[in-house]
């Protein structure tokens, strides 16, 4: 067995769930929704992804969670820390 293939269980960096625009209610526990618009897909952990019928499709995740995912932008730019 000389084949080394990545299993699909292992999330790659790009498929990690993330959200830049997250809105939460003030209830306990909070009800949070990611309002990011993505093209053709939602983040990897999204259970209820709603897309427009346009091309490319604009998709938003309709899940309600009690937390927000990491922001998508932060992983790529470290420039924000230098201010």
UniProtKB/Swiss-Prot annotation:
Question: Membrane-spanning regions, if any?
Answer: none
The keyword Disulfide bond appears for this protein: yes
Q: Which Gene3D superfamilies match?
A: Cysteine Protease (Bromelain) Inhibitor, subunit H
Point out the annotated site residues (description: Reactive bond for chymotrypsin).
Answer: 53-54
- Respond yes or no to whether keyword Ion transport is given for this record: no
Q: In this UniProt entry, which cysteines form S-S bonds?
A: 18-72, 19-34, 22-68, 24-32, 42-49, 46-61, 51-59
Kindly give the CDD domains that the UniProt entry links to this protein: BBI (cd00023)
Q: Pfam families attached here?
A: Bowman-Birk_leg (PF00228)
Which chain positions carry the site (Reactive bond for trypsin)? 26-27
Example GO molecular function: serine-type endopeptidase inhibitor activity
One GO cellular component term of this record is:
extracellular region
Q: Tell me which InterPro entries the record gives.
A: Bowman-Birk_prot_inh, Prot_inh_BBI
| Alphabetic keyword roster | Disulfide bond, Protease inhibitor, Serine protease inhibitor
Note on file?
Several variants were isolated from a commercial Lima bean preparation. Some lacked 8, 12, or 14 N-terminal residues and 2 C-terminal residues.
Homology family: Belongs to the Bowman-Birk serine protease inhibitor family.
What is the name of the protein in this document? Bowman-Birk type proteinase inhibitor
Source organism (scientific name):
Phaseolus lunatus (Lima bean)
Taxonomic lineage: Eukaryota, Viridiplantae, Streptophyta, Embryophyta, Tracheophyta
